[in-house]
């Protein structure tokens, strides 16, 4: 891996923050992202407790990946990407970001997008975790969002300034597994920001140009 991965991730997310200034959080908009499978029926409190436990587990795993000793920055990023790849509903997120554009793509274009998307999106989330790893997670509230999802609102202390607010949108799949379909830090949802950005980019430059850009940024 070339360059300094985490610095490049921070530069990318800095531009996202500027783009997202006027974008409401996903927890408030609650878009209906397509789900590959139906959610299990569960008692509301049981589903909420499971979602809280999953958010805590994912945070702990991310902390281990990003703070391990004796590993390079690139190795830490790779370990963190593995945590996210296992915890995120990448298919749901990837489809949501493409929106209706996916319907016009060829099988080859979809295959390339699906191949490069995991590396691309986990790099963007990596910077959001940089400010919360190793800090205690405090659950403020959790609530059901529709029939399938739970929003877990948490905060992490910051050395200077107020706490960092993080909303975790968790979905329980039919097979019983828990998956994150969005992580919203300080009110900014990469899922929503990138959906708008992808749509505008494709309209101006075409699908192939977007795929080339994602490949380049995933390997940066």
Name these PLM-found stretches:
Residues 36, 40-125:
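Early exported N-terminus immediately downstream of N-terminal targeting peptides
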Residues 14-21:
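Bacterial N-terminal signal peptides
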Residues 182-220:
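Low-complexity, intrinsically disordered terminal/linker segments enriched in charged
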Residues 4-13:
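Bacterial N-terminal signal peptides that target proteins for export
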Residues 23-27:
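Sec/Tat signal peptide C-region and signal peptidase I cleavage site
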Residues 163-192:
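Short beta-strand edge/turn micro-motifs at domain boundaries
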Residues 102, 119-120, 144-145, 158-159, ...:
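Solvent-exposed loop/turn segments at secondary-structure junctions
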